[in-house]
Amino acid sequence: MEYNKVIKNINNYFFNLSVIKYIFFILILSYVVFLPFGFLFNNYEYDIGGPQSIINASFLGKIFIGSLLAPIFETFVFQYIPIELLDKIKIKKNKDFFVLIISSLFFSLTHTYSLIYVLYTFVMGIFLSYTYILYKKKNFHPFWIVVIIHSLRNTITTFILFLF
């Protein structure tokens, strides 16, 4: 099976998933993809860093900032603005791929706490940008679907870090 056909089949599969199933799938996938990065964090970096305002915040502060404010702000800045602007450019071939990479690159370059974290957030940026593009094509609230995924991801991670 050729590469373009595989991509098209995957895209069709995601397009036909219900919103709840898609969100669940992307959340699970985001943690599966994190596994090799987790190995790198544990073996090569003791602290990935992060913004001091979040590191020093209380648990509720971390939830408020990381699960509400950051996802809304970052979705607006790193998915909505670049994707909507780049969507207006007349590119005939692989436009979605180009837009996805640019948006993901912007997202990852603002998470420069460590090189490994930049690489990990680039992959997360691909998931979030893909989601925005997909739900824009479905004409079903792409901004809020991305915010929900990002919020859930950050909330789950905050609870995991709090418990362990």
Where are each of the predicted segments found?
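Juxtamembrane helix-loop-helix connectors linking adjacent transmembrane helices
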Residues: 2-70, 83-89
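Transmembrane helix-loop-helix hairpins at the membrane interface
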Residues: 31, 35, 63-164
